[in-house]
Amino acid sequence: MQRDCVSPTKLENRIKKIVHKPFFKIALFSTTSMTVLGSVVIAPSLPALQSHFQNIAGIDFLSKLVLTLPALFVMLFSPLSGYLLDRYGRIKFLFPAMAIWSLSGFSGFFLDNIYLILVSRAIFGIATAFVMTGATALVGDYYLGEDRQKALGLQGFATAVGSAVFISLGGYLSSIDWRYPFLAYLLGIAIAIFAYTKLFEPHRKKTKKTHKEVEGSNQKFNFLMFLPVYLLVFFCMVAYYISPTQIPFFIVHNLGKNGDIVGISMSASSIAYGVFSLFYNRFRNIWSIYGIYALGLFLMGTCFLLLYVFHNYLIVMVSLMFLGAGGGLLIVNSSSYLLSIAPEMQRAKALGFFASAIFLGQFFSPLMTQPIVDRMSILGLFLIFTCLLYMLGLFFIFKSRMKKNFRKLQS
């Protein structure tokens, strides 16, 4: 009863103090980082997994599907998760999803059937949809304005640091046995318990009027307004996911390195992703949305240009840092822009489709890139994506210039 009597201003001030506490941020951003760990942690074990199931027909494709199948189910269930989270709240779905995420991910450790592993990865993807949408929606609920831009940068940094640590660990564990990286998913249980003690349901009015507003906002959801962001994110994730789906094979087969080296290489990308995400707010204070898009695309394009021209391990490390830097800017920039234009009562729904675009890109990445590798070799793949990313970057430079000229004419 006492809580209901608190004025909105006092309540908002109290919430603002809570959400800026260090342990609260650790709980929140650990939760958001879980979704990325879901894929990268097992990437170094793919060559060994493929060898283990070498007698299975189509294992070349199925082994990559172990990594990307969750993305398909995230794509399918993220819009539903967004609707449910907007309608009924965030927390009641988030914590059960985190538990399912951990258990279904861990099951790959003891399953010895590639098809059962794929089933477990599908369940894992459904849980990921709720965790990713719920956690990112909480960031949008807890923080506003510049605080939100900083929070999104911290989210990207926490995700990347966790990714770097666990993909390195995954690379080391995969050098022992391909099953061991699946043990890392048990960390989700510890994160869920810690988050349960810190996170809370954001203050939302629960009057009949609000429920009608929610129903109206659901009917008026303007998908086309967000579509350009979704398409751009989809393409960027197709390009970004060349790293875990194709480059491990390039390192092992073309450069003759071991699985533990693959993990270290992937972690270089994650570290750069985190650093550039962390400083996103500073980039945003200098450059426009279009300018940051152009920078991110040029950085990613430079990665594939270096891989195409130079064929040694040091260049792979440097190029993956370019890829991570560009990917970090692009995803955080898109998240920030999306949260700034999405109405409050449609925030989770907009983020649900955003998650769908991200994971749809992850799922389609090997489907779109493997035929190019088969026909033109992996070097041909690098050249094609160099050209595509540079051309798209030039497009955003043109858009940025046009916008500046339009403002000058208005003034």
In which residue ranges do the predicted regions lie?
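Paired small-residue
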Residues: 100, 104, 115-123, 314-322
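Extracytoplasmic gate region of multi-pass secondary transporters
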Residues: 226-267
